Amino acid sequence: GARPVGLHGASSGVVAGVKRPPRVVSGGGPDPIDFGLVGDITGFDEALLGLLLGAGHVPVLACLAADASGQALNVNADIVANQVASALGAAHLVLVTSTPGVLRDVKDPASRLRTLTVAQAKAAIADGTVTGGMIPKLEESIGALADGRVGAIHIVGDVGVGDLVREIETAGAVGTALMA
């Protein structure tokens, strides 16, 4: 099987970024918020990631980026995953979360939506079906699908042996599959 290689994104510039500038945020009052050492991604070392993948390794990235001076910056895990998948043209991206997928009712795991198109995901956000932390997760995923380089994004929860393979082989088998 595949062999994982743990890296943090700032290692050898695997993930490049810039410090997020202060800005006014919804619900944060009128003054700009300084995000500290939070960064926004500007690029990846696709050659290094490709080399690792080509050698049968699976890069496991801790969500840090490095700016031009080498300063480590914290970046959102979903953003890193979606942008790496897009940069590499991944056929599938699996996001593991605390719920078994996108739920119609966050209190009812049986309300899992098995598949969603981008249009359906946007509608579910707009009509309030999707709430909380699932909104930015879907928004980032929609962005990754928009360029056409990622085939499908699978959002899954607690998975057992063989579940990831089942989800990839049958979209929505154990989670929610988001497709263009």
List each language-model region with its residue ranges.
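C-terminal catalytic "cap/lid" subdomain
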Residues: 1-180
